[in-house]
Swiss-Prot record:
Similarity annotation: Belongs to the phosphoglycerate mutase family. BPG-dependent PGAM subfamily.
UniProt keyword RNA-binding, yes or no: no
Entries under InterPro entries matching the protein: His_Pase_superF_clade-1, His_PPase_superfam, PG/BPGM_mutase_AS, Phosphogly_mut1
Organism lineage: Bacteria, Bacillati, Bacillota, Clostridia, Eubacteriales
Record pathway: Carbohydrate degradation; glycolysis; pyruvate from D-glyceraldehyde 3-phosphate: step 3/5
Isomerase recorded as keyword: yes
Role, per record: Catalyzes the interconversion of 2-phosphoglycerate and 3-phosphoglycerate.
Protein name, entry field: 2,3-bisphosphoglycerate-dependent phosphoglycerate mutase
Annotated site residues (Transition state stabilizer) in this chain: 182
Amino acid sequence: MIKLVLVRHGESLWNLENRFTGWTDVDLSENGLKEARRAGKILKKNGFVFDVAYTSVLKRAIRTLWIILYEMDLAWIPVFKSWRLNERHYGALQGLNKAETAKKYGEEQVHKWRRFVNVKPPELTKEDTRYPGNEYKYKDLNEEQIPLTENLADTERRVLEEWRGNIAKDLKEGKRVIISAHGNTLRALVKYLDDIPADNVANLNIPTGIPLVYELDEKLKPITHYYLSDKE
């Protein structure tokens, strides 16, 4: 049996402020730091060990992973960072307060932007200061790879490129893997692993800082999955 652990980053400063974050590189809140430490301690308490780790290129996920591995005395294992594990890009909504956006556009429209698989928020322009192409960390991406906005299907597409190209190979080689990523990238991966129909994804939620364990067969098909909490 193969075990895979998924962790959504601890609460970020913009989670706390109820803002759309996307590719904006905000840090963890104080509570988020506590969530990351707690996740590391829970994993260690339950006997988990990892050979390799994956995360995005956004500091809230990277820092969460660092803290988890530190708490587990595993700071030395290889860590691979990929933009393909970044949060879904929220386009022109990035930085906006979710409640205020709902008042402006209506709760139904915002719900569709956030939760429907094939609905995209309004695009950024390349002249916008929030455009990822302005950031050094994305200098090696071509223009087609840098989103102006995304829906969940777009996010799933790039997440699965990372899954098939690297993560799945490590798992099949017997490596024990942890992924520290984001709400929508993990929703996309869970949708794929559990073969969830697009119509049922709207209510799928991944909480911050709580390890989600998948037990997989040799073909990487889920046998079961469960969250690790303080009570276990």
